[in-house]
Amino acid sequence: MNKHYQIVIIGGGTAGVTVASRLLRKNQNLKEKIAIIDPADHHYYQPLWTLVGAGVSSLKSSRKDMESVIPEGANWIKQAVSSFQPENNSVILGDNTVVYYDFLVVAPGLQINWSSIKGLKENIGKNGVCSNYSPDYVNETWNQISNFKQGNAIFTHPNTPIKCGGAPMKIMYLAEDYFRKHKIRSNANVIYATPKDALFDVGKYNKELERIVEERNITVNYN
């Protein structure tokens, strides 16, 4: 059965849920006229994963049932969108249902394709390879940090659009601090690899970060 909503939001992440909540708070007449389309069972507060990877918080604390975060007055459609039809103001769902809209908000987040980097899919989550960008592997980050004894600790900034550009640097500083507190810093070569030509895009902050990495004896490989 085809459906129509005044506002359709694709994505039940922080962005999609926040937009729906603010619209409903601003205009109560939008109740039952907003749909959030997302196939996921769980909603994750992903900014917390930096602290999960550093052993400061738990993955469980970042996760809630999707149903519990859908704002009152919005309708959750537990489906994936298979195609857009902007000429008809509609989207087609995985079961071929057509959902029509007056306004569309597109906030599906990013899909991580581990297989795009040779060897990464086979090694992610083991063999010293971890990532804070996925609930499947973020706990392995803490496992690697807490069991580190000596060698190279390499933190990489991807050369593609990512969920949080500062995340690789944040976990690097937290790991480096952990190494210092546990008196193994002298055994660690902390390396930050970035495809960019600066640590941060804003000059005054970049200058301060350059001072910090030098002070902490962190090697930065640019470009």
Which residues are covered by each model-predicted region?
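Beta1-alpha1 glycine-rich phosphate/pyrophosphate-binding loop at the start
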Residues: 2-75, 159-203
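Short gly/ser/thr-rich secondary-structure transition/capping motifs
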Residues: 17-18, 86-90, 135, 219, ...
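Amphipathic coiled-coil/heptad-repeat helices and related helical stalk/stem segments
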Residues: 62, 137-141, 205
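Short, conserved catalytic or adaptor-binding loops enriched in Gly and charged residues
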Residues: 66-71, 120-124, 211-214
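A conserved beta-strand/loop element that lines the FAD pocket in flavoprotein oxidoreductases
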Residues: 71-85, 214-223
